[in-house]
Design a protein with these regions (language model features):
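Bacterial N-terminal signal peptides that target proteins for export
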Residues: 37-48
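C-terminal motif of bacterial Sec signal peptides marking the signal peptidase cleavage site
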Residues: 56-59
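Bacterial signal peptide processing site
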Residues: 61-63
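Short, surface-exposed binding/anchoring microloops in extracellular/periplasmic proteins
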Residues: 68-96
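Tryptophan-paired
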Residues: 97-148
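Edge beta-strands of extracellular beta-sandwich domains
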Residues: 152-157
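Compositionally biased low-complexity segments at domain edges in trafficked proteins
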Residues: 167-236
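Short, low-complexity, Pro/Ser/Thr/Gly-rich segments in the mature regions of secreted, periplasmic
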Residues: 238-255
Length: 255
């Protein structure tokens, strides 16, 4: 059986370790006395069809079901990852619990985009990875490695209703990139990560400005990077960023 959370994310079910159960094959049944070989074959075919029908009904009733495609004014919304310049991070996972209560695991991760300055934040960001087949976010779980410290952090961020309202509200705007009017949506959630476990979250759109959702304090992941799977080893820090930290240190308190 697949749990409701796994049903919301077929990729998670694929991580299960499926194995065939070995069994002893029984000997073929003897043909009853007085019954022709053709009668036996016909009877066995009917029995096989009945078994297949039962198996099909069982699979339909108990197998994983894909959630319906959410009704949004766009094909997908986006998650962007950001960090201050030289404050290198590695995102282990971004998980989403959408407003339907369906969980989607590892929808994003890896490297982040870096702002133009080390201290303070930029105005949000643009771009990101499309989050397909997922409804508007109710919660976002983030776990990452702050490589300049180094330290592993995790946080569960509650997304307020006003953010979801903004994400589906159309707005006419002159897009500065194309210099023409268009109807745009705030379909991007940007996650900014800084040393000390600081997280800033914005909502915005490609042709619209970004609005801050909030500033949050993450907690240290007690098991370390990769929840202990790497035995305390972090992703290596880029030499350029290491040289900057060695010379200037980490400007805690500026984010």
């Amino acid at each position: 059986m697949v749990s409701p959370m796994e049903a919301g994310n077929p990729a998670m079910a694929a991580h299960k370790d499926f194995r065939f159960n070995s069994r002893v094959v029984p000997p073929s049944p003897r043909r009853p006395h007085g019954q022709s070989e053709a009668d036996c074959v016909s009877r066995m075919k009917r029995l096989a069809c009945a078994v297949l029908m039962l198996c099909s009904l069982s699979a339909c009733g108990g197998g994983p079901r894909l959630p319906p495609t959410p009704k949004l004014p766009y094909s997908a919304w986006y998650i962007g990852l950001a960090a201050p310049k030289h404050m290198e991070v590695w995102v282990e996972t971004v998980d989403v619990l959408d407003k339907r209560g369906l969980a989607f695991y590892r929808v994003h991760g890896g490297v982040a985009s870096y702002t133009g300055k080390t201290e303070g934040w930029h105005g949000g960001g643009s771009g990101g990875k499309p989050i397909n087949h997922v409804d508007l976010p109710g919660q976002i779980f983030l776990r990452w490695q702050s490589l300049v410290e180094p330290q592993a952090y995790k946080i569960n961020i509650q997304i307020p209703q006003w953010v979801r309202d903004e994400m589906v509200r159309p707005e006419r705007v002159i897009c500065k990139f194309k210099q023409r009017w268009k109807t745009d949506y705030r379909d991007i959630i940007a996650l900014g990560m800084a040393p000390g476990g600081i997280v800033k979250v914005w909502v915005g759109g490609g042709c619209l400005g970004f609005t801050e959702i909030g500033r949050f304090q993450a907690e240290v992941e007690p098991r370390g990077p990769y929840r202990g799977a790497s035995k305390g080893k972090y992703v290596p820090l880029e030499p350029e960023n290491k040289a900057y930290i060695d010379q200037h240190g980490i400007p805690y308190g500026s984010w």
